[in-house]
Amino acid sequence: VNGHPAQFGFVQPTYPGDPNGQDDPNPAAHEASQVNPVDGPDNNPLPPACSPALPDTKTPADALDGTQCPANKLVITPSAPIGDGSTFVVTVRYTGRPGVHNDGDGTTEGWFRAPDGGFVTTEPVASEDWMPLNDYPAAKPTYDFSDSVNAGKTVIANGVLVSVRQNPASQEFPGGSVTWNWHSAAPIASYLVEDSVGNYSLTSRTVDGITFYQAQDTSIGAAQQQANAAIMDMQPDITAFESQFNGPYPFVSGGVIIGTPSVSFDEEMQTMIAFSGGAIDTDTLYHENMHQWWGDNVTEDDYHMTFYKEGLATLAEFFYHARLAEDAAGGPSSPQGQAAFEASLVDQFNKLYRSSGSFWTTAPSNPEPFSLFSGSNTYDRPGAAYIALRQILGPGNFDRVLQQLQRTYGGGSISEAQLEAAFHQWLPVQSDSCQERLSQFFTQWFDTAYPTGGGAHRPMITGPGLDGPGFYSAPGVCA
């Protein structure tokens, strides 16, 4: 710390707000669980200290509830006190073999090994499996990357490529090495740090002042690489399209890396979207590119807010299909095309609103780790809610909300209350009754778990022109 040796150790995490801190002697303060409170085999009334790391996707969700969290929190103690408000530098030198993290649903994330290197996709917490960091989404430092790897290998990271330096043979690299330097001036959330190494082809081009990188593992077949490139070439156009709603693209670069490992998911790594399994698809590119605004530039303040950014990224997929309908009907400048765009969104909402079964049974703002990235509560339900909000506010005001949020919270994080306050500000009818109705809308769509079935067991406030009771109409009319 500040150039002086420091003590360090690894401790178990404790539940948020524990008055006894990280050294709480009560074992119940360090238990894992899918639910809050833990309520494990000893009926623990405390919140969980970590999510259980299920060994595979076949293991029951609650199998590890009530077990002890691992001692994986690095605690550094400086040799001298640090003054309030002062700047200090912590340097951590470490060695190890990067790996993967088992999540609360049994899937894995982290540094996936490939025959020629590694491929990084780490949502929500697996950056800790290859580097020490404050592993929480609202912690957003800037990054400089300097990776020395075997000669002939390529390093793909966030931001812009600063330099590539060839090095002579050494004891560590008998065949020579190459040092890749990348720089991100923009802050990056903990789970969005990219640092893949391998036999990647790397190209770049600049469109509208943004440098777009494209990287593919060279072991991907020629025909698939060509198909991938055709979709990657769409990224500048997709960025321009999504900018109509969100405002200017928030970074100086963008890009896509396509690796070969078949991992659990593709991911919106900041400025360098990661696609797995050797392939890319257009729907997902619209989704992940939307994340550059939502999740990347404006990050959720905690994991319970995952629905906020995944819902907006799902909305981008709805916008994509509405765009296709618009083009087929005459294009964005024709009345027929514009009508087709709006009709596509209405149809998408109505289809989702008819959902039954377990679609409505988990509140988006209160997910379990087991279903965080696999349930309708994270993707389709908030995506439908945003369509309804667009109908309630009108397309123009809806876009103004998105752009205001980017200006206000860009580079930082956002809470649910802050998100909802912005929509309240742009509600066309500012009466007390309409403001109260919008508050009820958010409670129903974001914060309520309904019994199984749908029908009467689903939100009872929708929007103008949509299935359901609407917003400015009975019951509970506002004016």
List each model region and its residues.
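Juxtacatalytic substrate-recognition/specificity segment
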Residues: 145, 178-181, 199-305, 316
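Zinc-dependent metallopeptidase catalytic helix centered on the HExxH motif
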Residues: 138, 272-349
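The feature captures the short pre-catalytic strand/loop hairpin that immediately precedes
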Residues: 354-372
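Second-shell loop/turn segments in exported
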Residues: 75-81, 219-230, 274, 302-303, ...
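Extracytoplasmic/secreted proteins, especially bacterial periplasmic and envelope-associated proteins
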Residues: 144, 230-241, 284-288, 307-315, ...
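Long, His/Glu/Asp-enriched segments that create or flank divalent metal/ion-associated functional microenvironments
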Residues: 239, 451-479
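Extended, low-hydrophobicity, Ser/Thr/Pro/Gly-biased non-transmembrane segments
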Residues: 23-80, 87-197
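Amphipathic alpha-helical substructures
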Residues: 328-333, 375-462
